[in-house]
Structures are given as structure tokens and as C-alpha cells.
Amino acid sequence: MATDPRKILVTCALPYANGSIHLGHMLEHIQADIWVRYQRLRGNDVNFICADDAHGTPIMLKAQQMGISPEEMIAAVSEEHQKDFAGFDISFDNYHSTHSDENRELASHIYLELKKNGFITSRTISQLFDPEKEMFLPDRFVKGTCPKCKAEEQYGDNCDNCGETYSPTDLINPKSAVSGATPVMKDSEHFFFDLPQFESMLKEWTRSGSLQTETANKMQEWFESGLQQWDISRDAPYFGFEIPGETNKFFYVWLDAPIGYMGSFKNLCNKRDDLNFDEYWKKDSTTELYHFIGKDIVYFHSLFWPAMLDGAGFRKPNNVFVHGYVTVNGAKMSKSKGTFIKAGTYLNHLDPECLRYYYAAKLNSRIDDLDLNLEDFTQRVNSDVVNKIVNLASRNAGFITKRFDGKLADNFAEPELYNEFIAAADRIAELYETREFGRAIREITALADKANQYIDEKAPWVLAKEEGKEQELQEVSSVGINLFRVLMAYLKPVMPELAARTEAFLNETLTWEGVAQPLVAHEITKFKALFARIDPKKVEAMIEESKEDAAIEMAAKEKAEAEKEKASQTELDKDPIADEIEFDAFEAVDMRIARIISCEEVPKANKLLKFQLDIGGETRQVFSGIKSAYKPEELEGKLTVMVANLKPRKMKFGMSEGMILAAGPGGKDLWILEPHEGAQPGMRVM
């Protein structure tokens, strides 16, 4: 008896909109996409959504550094993110942004509901404040010396050197990472979500049995240490949504970020008539909601998020699926080693389906870190996908197309073997459902081994040379093609592009239930190469490009730091005061007010302008090296200051009878001295 399709809403954690997608991000998105594609393959109604997390201080400051608005920056980043996800065949139904009208409305609604229900409190707190930038500083925007190990240049929340955690006020000699200024303490009213009121509900949710064991255990630790009120506000300047009814107060990015799941779905509902927002988010919804996230954000998704939803009258997630981190070659991803690999860099060199397969082969339902060993990656994909699975088709297709006009045998010669392959469907289905993808892949490759063993034993290449073996050759090759068909149906959630090419070859759409019966008397198309093996040289080229990208980024960062350091210097730091002189020496310099009668460029001189100056009854010709800062027509008629008793100097272009005074380091940064109104040509400057 057929059951109604499940209605499922699936989300991935929202990538932050200030940088590129890398292979660490791709683990989660590939994991979720495989699960979503499996559910769709089984006939379930799935909506798969995501968005960019587009608010917060880091985005505001990076946009300032780039000289563009935050809106311009997040739009460009969103375009890049969506291109990368599409490159890996991540089948989102909608990709949106937390900086959207839908998200603003929902964040305001949830906040006001929480406030109305008594879950929002306020109090005055003291925070570090940058007096130059006039902004409060998040922990990661304060640097100083670790109070424990005395390591310098440590962030305001923890020490990378010794691992100590502390308050930013504990740092020795704290400095603003934004301006370099010494921060001061300043009071401000902040708003808090009263999380402790939800402890009983959260404990019950934890005991539901659906959460991963590691997540439930971690939540128990948090319960034992005591839940704390959560600061959900930030002061201006801040890029985000203003809190309703408040002035210069904004929602902390982590309040509106998970609401972005709802905002993205709301945006999708506005595009489609068949979707109802309330059906999926109302308190008593019978639909299913699942979040795929990394282990670094469990706290927000397992405590704050379900509590916020419950307090505002919405449903809670059915589950939060947590994964570990990605390491490369057994170590943390490294820019200097070229193992911090951006998604776009990978796509420049390798087939995305290779990574999809490798991640699937190593994923399970636990919160384990996954190591992308590049040598093993190459060997496993080439061995499993090319040698075992795709080779099964290539070994048999030629006989069918050349000898039998592309037609499979009228009867199926190995029903028992085929039934063994079909019997594995329920086991593999359960493994997909429970996210035990690695075990599912092992089941599939074990079947591939059996299929290849059968072909090795029957040796169709030998049968092709023997008279009277035509029917057996067709039957054996047809068995091989059909077993390949079953394997590809099972692999379709993992390798959708390979599955699509297989469907074109088989002249049939692959479905989970459809492969229950073999293809007989069915016409296939001429075999074309379905999948290319990984060339180790392409892996090396990917690493080299990653190193080059890192070097360019480092050079740009160092340049920006140098410019920041230079900008923080005073003019006296840049150009210290000269040695003292006696008053008589100064008195010997005769400075006079001069009116610029005319100014013109000097032919063949890169820096010089030629001036005619009126100094009150006398005209002087002066050459001055300020061409890079001024156009001649900008200066004519202005008053300025000149040294009038400087000994005339004969130059290539004529006699210079004095010196015009200007301030600045040089180049375009030069400014002539201009007296106030009332000064007259010829007056002495005292």
C-alpha cells in the first residue's frame, strides 16, 4: 500500500558573506544534497534552501576596506557562492540572503513575540569602545598580550598560543584591531533573550532520542553548567536590522541568521503557488524540518534556535544533523601548503563528482572529522568509480551495439544474481536515510565487485571470438549492462551528472523502484566515455593554484596592514622635526605674501610649474615642483607664501628667483600655503 510522500524542509548552515566557499563548506552541502536527492528519488516532497549570512561587524568593516557599500559586497559574494554551489550540483530550491525584506519582517516579528511573552530583558553593560572609530568592539576585534602566557597579538576571547579563554578586558595592552587605538570602557543598554526560561523544554527536546548522541551529551553539559541569558543586541555602527522601537540598536547577527532559514523559505513561497509558509512553520506542523550544520555552531542551533522558535509560537526542528571538520592530508587546511582549497579553485581542475563520491565514501552519521587525503582521493575514485563501476558498462556496451544493433537480450539470463542486487535496495535505502553514506558506498562497491567477477568468469571477449556463442554473448553482456544500471540507480544521489549520462546511454530514466525489473529487449545508445579518471597532475595543479592564491592574498593583506600602520602614524612620526637652529638663522629668512599672476607647465619638465609672482611692486619668476598636485589654472590669482631672499638659481628652463612654500610628503599630497583674507602681496610673514 502506497504511503503519502513526506513533506520535508532541509537547510544548510548559511555561509558568511565575506569570503569564498572552500572544501570545508562543501562537506556539509554535499552531505545535505545527497540526502535530499535520495529523498526525492524515493518520491518525497523536499524543499532544500539556503542563504548567505550577510550581517555583522566583519562585513561592515571589510566593505569599508574595499571602498564599497556592504550591500554591494554581499551581492558580489552571493553571486560567487551560488556559482560554486551550482558547480558542485547542489540542488537548492532557493538561495537567498539574510539581508532581505522577508528576513527583516520575520526577525522583527519573532523579537516582538518574544518580548510580548516576557522572554526579552534589558540591562546596562560595560564594553570596550574604540574612541577613534566611535564603535563598540566585538571580542575578535580587540588584540593584545595574553594575560597567561604573555603571547602578543592575541584576540580578545582566547589565546591561539596557549588556549586560554578570557574577557577582552583581561588582555594586557589591548588595542583595537580596527584602528589601533587603545580602547576605553563604555556603558550601553543591551537586550537579552532569557534562555533559562526554556530549560525544561530543551531538556525534553534533548530526550526525544532523535538528536545525535554527541549533540545530546554536549547539551547535557551545558545544562549542568547552567544556561545564561543571551545578548541579542549590538550598538551602532552595525550592518544589520535595527531593533523595533529602539534607536541605534541592532539585532546581533546570530539572532537573524537562523531566521534566514525561514526568510529563504518565505521567499520561495512567494515565488510558488503550491507552497504554504505556515504549513511548514506553524507550531503543530506535520511537515519535517532538518538542519545540516557543522559542529562549531551546535550551541546556537540546539539551544537558542529551538528556544526562540518555541517562544515565538513556531515549530522546532525534527533534528539537527551535525558533521565534523575537513582536514587535508591529515592536517588542518593550510594556505601555505596549498591545502586551503576554494571551491572555485577545485572546479578549475577537477570533476565535482569526484569530491562528491569521496566525501560520501567517508561520511557517517557521527560528528567525526573527515580527512581529504589527496592520494587516497585519487586512488579511490579511480579504483571504485572508473575501474569497478563505469568499466562494467564499457566492458559490455561495445558487444551490444556492434553485434546486436544496441538491443539487449530478450530474456534475462541471471535472475538470482539480479535479485541479489535488488535485495540490497532496502539496506542501502536505510543507510541513505540515516546518513551512513560510507556504508552505503561500501555496499554498492561490493555489488560492483560481484558484477565484475561475473563478467570475468563469463569472459564475453572470449565468447565474441567463438562460433555459435552469439546468444550467450548477448545475454552475458545484457546482464553486465543491467547490473551497472542497478548500481547507478543506487549511486544517483551521490553522482547526479554521471547518472544523467548513464540515463542517456541506457535510454531510460533511473528510478529506485524502476530497477526492480531488468531491461530486456531494450535498445541502448552507442557507448561514450561516462567518466574520466583523476589525473594526479591536475591535483598538483590545484594545489599550486591554491598556493598562488594564498600568496596574492597574503601580499594584499600585508599591503593593507602597512597602509593601516602608515595611516595610524602622526605627521611627526613620518617626518621628525629637524635639529634646532638659532633665532638669527630663522630671522635671516625673508618670507613674503605673493599673488600668483600666471602659472604654466614647463615643456619637457615632469614636475615643474613656472610662476610669475607679484610681491608688491615687484614681479618674480619662480619654478616650483608641485605639478603633480595642481593644474596651472587652479593656482592663478591665489595668494601664497614665498621665500623672497633666496639667492636666484639658474635652471635649465630659466632663472628661479625664490621658493613657494608648500606642505605635504610629495606627489599628489602637496598643498601650497594660503594666507587669510586681508593679507596683501609684499607683506612680510613674521
UniProtKB/Swiss-Prot annotation:
Known catalytic reactions: tRNA(Met) + L-methionine + ATP = L-methionyl-tRNA(Met) + AMP + diphosphate
GO cellular component: cytosol
Gene3D superfamilies: HUPs, Isoleucyl-tRNA Synthetase, Domain 1, Methionyl-tRNA synthetase, Zn-domain, Nucleic acid-binding proteins
Cofactor or coenzyme needed: Zn(2+)
Entry EC no(s): 6.1.1.10
Localization annotation: Cytoplasm
SUPFAM superfamilies hit by this protein: Anticodon-binding domain of a subclass of class I aminoacyl-tRNA synthetases (SSF47323), Methionyl-tRNA synthetase (MetRS), Zn-domain (SSF57770), Nucleic acid-binding proteins (SSF50249), Nucleotidylyl transferase (SSF52374)
Record's protein name: Methionine--tRNA ligase
Lineage: Bacteria, Pseudomonadati, Pseudomonadota, Gammaproteobacteria, Vibrionales
